[in-house]
Amino acid sequence: MGSVRASSLTLANRSGDVKCSVAYLLYFSFAMTPKSKPGKRAPRKGPRVKLVAQAALPTRHGRFTIYGFKGSGPEEEAIALVRGKLDGKTAPLVRVHSQCLTGDVLGSLRCDCRAQLELSLKKIGQAGSGLLLYLPQEGRGIGLMNKLRAYQLQDGGMDTVEANETLGFAADARDYDFSAQILKKLGATKIRLLSNNPEKVRQLEESGIRVVRRVACQPRVSKTSRAYLQTKKSKMGHLLDGL
């Protein structure tokens, strides 16, 4: 894969460095990009995946390289955090993570998104190599405002699946073909996938990625997120233990 030259970036104020979480930086890298309506895709023209930039990203889980990718459609953009070298021979540990402003950045306990993000980075850091894809798929692909509307319905007694469907969306509107193209560009065509979602495994394999092993990504369950996770297990087939 080709490389893009990038200068180092320091965030600082008068009193010293500003400390931002990885989740905060990842989420707001997408914040200023115009989004089309959920489920609407522009016609694809030209190459599916374009490397836009790369830079060093030291984190508390180790040193990563951060890559920015864009595709042909307005919603096709993603960030990859790569640790170590991807030699194409071994199967790296991979997390394909959908952004969640309320969880990843604001610390919401309605879901386990932030806990999964942190657990994934920790595992990849400890392994010494691997990668995390961070995708703008807020609310399982329905967008931030619609996710908040779904929250409002859940406050009225619906579960996460019923709320999405009441709003006219699928329970899970995400597509992982773009993710697969990025993995191929990075040379990760066979992987160990950090996921509890068999649908994610299926879609990646259909797009040409060999998932040699699914690695459970199940942080400790909180009282607040238990019902949400039970719904994902019973209605969406997620592989979750102890629920």
Residue ranges: model-predicted function:
Residues F28-L243:
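Catalytic domains of riboflavin
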